[in-house]
Amino acid sequence: KEYSDVFIIVLAAAGLVFSHAVMSFALAFMALRFVLVDKSRFVACRKDVLLAMLAYFALFLAGMAWSGDMNEALKQLNKNLPFLIVPLYFFAIPLPNRKSLFQIAFCAIAFLIIASCIALIRLYFFDVEDIRSALPFGSHIRFALFVCTATGFLAIRIMERYKQASGKEIGICLGLIVYFIAYLVLSSSLTGIMLLLIVFMPVCLFVATKRMPKRIFSFAVLIFSFAVLIFSFAVSFFAYDYFVPKNGECKNGMIENGYCHQVNNETIRDSERAEMAVGLKKYLNIAPDSLFTDKDCKYAFTDIASRYFVCKGLERTAENWSRLSPSDLDNIRNGIPNPVYASGNPLKVRIYKTFFEFEAYRKWGKIKGSSLVQKIELWQKGSRIVEKGGRWLFGVGTGDLRQELNKSLKESNSQLADSGLMIHNQYLSIFITFGLVGCLVFLFFIIYPAYRTKLYKNAFYVYFLALVLVSMLSEDTLDNQQGIMFFCIMNSFFLSRNIETDKKTYLCSNEL
């Protein structure tokens, strides 16, 4: 029985990283195990905590009553089944011992290492554009969240056990922390890096003040401060290189790599396209009207070449094609509009692309293809939904969020209409779907179990919860099967260890 639970949890961990189907199998096994397991522990548990944990799923059930699209409501209910099954499972099974916990943790970290290695190999050694394509198993944002969780847990473990831990154990943990942080940088995961800056550093410093000598704490502060300084300096340097003109002021144009695009005069633009067309035919044997296909978008090679010339600081003339290197020609042939994108510095590439997204939005109002600008557009249009018909109290219902969001986008003639995108803010999603009542239920669902079980004293749980809550500001963390299963498993695992009604207490910090 003990090993069956280890198998189920390890299977769920593998599914989180590698496969939605495996996650579904793990969830089915959890439901079956709950039916078959001895219910003595379940009967003795704190029912108020369990009911609070089931409140969010109950919200989806209740929301079906005022949902217009019942088919979508049933899909949402099915997707959110982990909020029902996972807590019941963890509250019923026997508590895993230390050996089982080690086996589960070992497998979970091994899965992260394997998946991250595959992603980096695909990203750097194969023709893969970005981490979204390099990580074929699921959402790269959710994977970054998993990596940040593992990084924080390893750091907290070192700080809480530094007196008892062997040098080998500390060395392994530090090595894994360095590897996971390196993965986030090499994969240019801005979300993961920001989560580390906002959550990892403050929580770790707080734990260090409680657990470690002042000398080691001071050293940790120095390391963290140096990391923040380096990151801030890099972003500032990139911004200076990108936005500060290198050849005079840039009036009525957009700037890239310090050079100005003059895009207002169509006569000049047509003349420059003609010059680019000559070079495309002569040097790359590409027809002037050829298009480069990137996913769902198509771009004219003349525009790609024109932008590349500007980024190099070259005048857009046929004669200047001779000044391009073979690698420059290959970049244009491969649809790369900026030489920085082929520099091999993933963090710099991601930041420069973000800069271009803002410039394109400022100059042309271009939204599609820009992740950050898209989110702002979705937040603006999504917030309008609750203003109609007094929906601020109960929301639109379990199954109507996607439909109502698309309707709002169409009414404002947004470029994101019919894109199928969601809000990308979990709090706003809950408010639109279930209104103010739903937000209050969600707060109860998050706060009450942690308060009742005193897990706010547990550094592991505080870090996990802070990480998830911060990620919800820019992502629908709980609107994706990976995110839902991850939250349910971690939250239920921690809470289920403090649910005994007698005076015996199980502290995760001492067992992990």
Q: Where do the model's predicted regions map?
A:
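Long extracytoplasmic/lumenal interhelical loops at the membrane interface
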Residues: A300-K312, R316-W321, P346-F355, E359-F434
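Membrane-embedded alpha-helical segments of multi-pass membrane proteins
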Residues: F18-V37, L77-Y89, R142-T151, M194-M201, ...
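Alpha-helical transmembrane segments of multi-pass inner-membrane proteins
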Residues: A12, A58-L61, A65, K99-E129, ...
